[in-house]
Amino acid sequence: MKVSIVGITGYSGLELVRILNGHQKVELVSVHATKEIGTKLSDIYSYLKGICDLEIQSFDSQKIMATADLVFFATPSGVAKELAKDFIAADFPVIDISGDHRLPAAIYEKWYKKAAAEQASLDKFTYALAELTDVKGKKFIANPGCYATATELALLPLVKEKLIDVNSIIVDAKSGLTGAGKVLSESSHFVNVHDNYVTYKLNRHQHIPEIVQELKRFDNNLEHIQFSTSLLPVNRGIMATCYVTLKKPLSNEAVSKIYQDLYADKPFVRLQQDLPELHNVIGSNFCDIGFAYNPVTNVLTVISVIDNLVKGAAGQAVQNLNLMMGWDETEGFPMTPSYL
């Protein structure tokens, strides 16, 4: 299968290159961006020399459709909704890593502060949390956000079984600096991040409605969550610490069984006896989950960790590609995290 990437110079685009390079059933045939046109990708990123020496091309939907079988969009929000139109009209497969096709139009505009995609386009896309969504045969995939992936995987077993007061959910999520994107901002400047801990977009992060939307599918009583986002002085990784009030006390063994039952055949979700740590998933498509119950407060703390660029972006996109095509969902993935 031949694929193209639009938005190649961002972190998610580069991570797609790394993962697809090891995929035996996929060939990357073109990469596209708005700058550095005509330059070899490996001349900009020397670590790719001999691995991906493709020249960066300007965006041309017709050329992509003539040479590839599917296109990934690894673009900032607001871009894919416009550039994907030709592909949608031609019924040409798209996996959108951005947030442009995840939410209803009115909700997108409220949280992203941008005009939404056309309704006809939104209707084509399937929001695909890979562990829970059947995407075989689908052509248009809205890849979940990084914070949303970590939070949904942590909480869905409890919400699905209706074991918690869904309006008691509090999530304290922390991300490595790549989660803030490549464009430099005051909050991501080295001197403000190094040896520091920064909270940003408190109560305003655009992944909040995405999480509510997906959890609400399993318990319609859910109306809101309390959600905070912070930057860690590390390159990669997300840790979502979720606090929920149980409807009735549960033993750790009972909680563990609930998670095991849902994720038993999900190769990228690992339940840890100890509380998860970031470096155990870095460079991988794993989501590690652990928990601890406090019988005094009747609060269950669930912690999930992912690599924001892999499971939170490019990795889940490739996992969804595998599932779309009916391949083994682990196809192309190095199964060992880099750890250090």
From Swiss-Prot:
Keywords: Amino-acid biosynthesis, Arginine biosynthesis, Cytoplasm, NADP, Oxidoreductase
Catalytic activity: N-acetyl-L-glutamate 5-semialdehyde + phosphate + NADP(+) = N-acetyl-L-glutamyl 5-phosphate + NADPH + H(+)
Active site, renumbered: C146
S-S pairs: none
EC class name: oxidoreductase
Principal localisation: cytoplasm
Enzyme Commission numbers on file: 1.2.1.38
Matches recorded under SUPFAM superfamilies: Glyceraldehyde-3-phosphate dehydrogenase-like, C-terminal domain, NAD(P)-binding Rossmann-fold domains
Pathway noted in the entry: Amino-acid biosynthesis; L-arginine biosynthesis; N(2)-acetyl-L-ornithine from L-glutamate: step 3/4
Any single GO CC term annotated in Swiss-Prot or TrEMBL for this entry: cytoplasm
GO function term, MF aspect, one: N-acetyl-gamma-glutamyl-phosphate reductase activity
Pfam families: Semialdhyde_dh, Semialdhyde_dhC_1
Protein's cellular compartments: Cytoplasm
One Gene Ontology term from the biological process aspect of the record: L-arginine biosynthetic process
Record-linked SMART domains: Semialdhyde_dh
PANTHER family: N-ACETYL-GAMMA-GLUTAMYL-PHOSPHATE REDUCTASE, CHLOROPLASTIC-RELATED, N-ACETYL-GAMMA-GLUTAMYL-PHOSPHATE REDUCTASE, CHLOROPLASTIC-RELATED-RELATED
Main function: Catalyzes the NADPH-dependent reduction of N-acetyl-5-glutamyl phosphate to yield N-acetyl-L-glutamate 5-semialdehyde.
NCBIfam families named in the record: argC
Protein family per UniProt: Belongs to the NAGSA dehydrogenase family. Type 1 subfamily.
Protein name in the entry: N-acetyl-gamma-glutamyl-phosphate reductase
Organism: Streptococcus mutans serotype c (strain ATCC 700610 / UA159)
Gene: argC
